[in-house]
Each structure stands twice: as structure tokens, then as C-alpha cells.
Design a protein with these regions (language model features):
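Active-site entrance/lid segments in N-terminal catalytic domains of soluble metabolic enzymes
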Residues: 1-170
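Glycine-rich beta-strand-to-loop/alpha-helix junction loops that act as flexible
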Residues: 172-174
Length: 174
């Protein structure tokens, strides 16, 4: 929690631009506390891939509201009926629950249009868009399955990834 607070605090120093963090969904243990620390420092964007971050939008909603947040936790060798959950209560970690926390925008990092479609339908909260990675993006050793839907003129190519807005953010002025 402290490390992410410091990283975001320092990243915000000296400018008025947006700051985001990229967390790996598969590294489950630190994510709840990491998100809280970053949000306390004024985080603008959360990007998550390396797994299916279906629960993260709701986690962001709950942390911003100073409520208990939970994530399912994968346990190797667990049976199908076992439910393992990580939980994080901001109040239990000394959070000032009267302080207003801004919920950061959430971008899911995906390598296939089927995953983007699944997240758009089944995510537990609101995602503002997707980063669609190509097969040569960092850490990938196999081509993406399916096709990458990048026909919309609003899509922006960033080398081996495309940023695709799921819903326009109408609260901002350009």
C-alpha cells in the first residue's frame, strides 16, 4: 500500500497530467492494498491484464467508497467447491473514511476480442475501455486468438497495442 502511494505521489509531482498504474491480475496478493495506496495518492488510471480482471471495476468502486473490497483468490489444488477470497477494508488500515476518494478509470489489457467482449458483458463494474495487445507485446510468446477489432477511427495505435474506449467519458472536456 505504501509503495504504491509513494510511486503515484512522486509520479504526480511537477505536472498536472494523468498518472496510471499497471498491475498484473495474476499477482493477486498485493493488488487490493496496492490499489488503495495508489488511490490515496490521486491515481487517475488503472490498467490490468495478465489474467481476467473481471472483479477489479467493483473493487475500485468499493475502495473509492471506503467499503470492504474482495477478490477471488486462486489456490492450486483447491477443489471446485472451495471459495478462497482476499479482502481489504480501508478503515482497518487507518483510512480517513470522511476523505473523498476519486475512482480511477479502469482499462483492461486484453489480447483477444473475445476477452474484451466477455469483460464488457460480465465485469462486476464499469471499465472505460481496453488496451488490446498484439502478439509481440511484452511477455507474449504466442499470437492472439481471434481478430483485433481496430476499425473505429477513435482507436489509437501505440505500437503493439491499441487503446479502445468502451464508452466515451462525457464528464471531461477536451
Amino acid at each position: 500500500m505504501l509503495a504504491n502511494f509513494v510511486e503515484v505521489f512522486l509520479a504526480r509531482s511537477g505536472h498536472h497530467g494523468a498518472v496510471g498504474i499497471n498491475l498484473l491480475t495474476k499477482l493477486q496478493l498485493p493488488n487490493l492494498a496496492s490499489l488503495h495506496g495508489a488511490m490515496l495518492a490521486g491515481l487517475n488510471y488503472v490498467l490490468m491484464g495478465a489474467g481476467i480482471p473481471r472483479e477489479v471495476p467493483l473493487v475500485l468502486d468499493r475502495i473509492a467508497s471506503h467499503e470492504m473490497a474482495t477478490l477471488h483468490f486462486d489456490v492450486e489444488g483447491a477443489t471446485a467447491g472451495d471459495a478462497h477470497v482476499l479482502s481489504f477494508d480501508p478503515a482497518a488500515h487507518g483510512a480517513d473514511v470522511t476523505r473523498v476518494l476519486t475512482r480511477p478509470q479502469f482499462l483492461a489489457i486484453v489480447a483477444a476480442n473475445s476477452l474484451a467482449a466477455t469483460l464488457a458483458r460480465k465485469a462486476s463494474g464499469r471499465a472505460c475501455g481496453f488496451v488490446v495487445e498484439g502478439p509481440t507485446a511484452g511477455g507474449h510468446n504466442a499470437p492472439a486468438r481471434g481478430t483485433v477489432p481496430c476499425r473505429a477511427p477513435a482507436n489509437r495505435s501505440t505500437g503493439n497495442a491499441w487503446v479502445i474506449a468502451a464508452r466515451p467519458n462525457r464528464s471531461r472536456t477536451s
